[in-house]
Amino acid sequence: ETAENIIGKINGLYPSPGAFFIHKGERYKILKADLAYSSGENGEVLNNYLEISCGNKKSIKVLEIQRQGKRPQNINEFMLGSQIKKGSNLNNA
């Protein structure tokens, strides 16, 4: 799916039901994200700020996220304790 479509779903599905992904059995709801221009394998986390490749040299940069059962967090706060690191692939999670 294109980065633009994913951004549209994030914005269109907020606040409910929301756009989410599953990583290591946990659900993460993306609350805010922007379009970015980086390349990598689809679903690959490109840096330590949770920028996720979507192909065609485009990616989504997550700005706000909510881990299942937790409060919403800005991405800087979230990444301090996150197990999702650069190089992780969310397609294989």
What do the predicted segments below correspond to?
Residues 1-93:
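An anion-binding loop in the catalytic cleft
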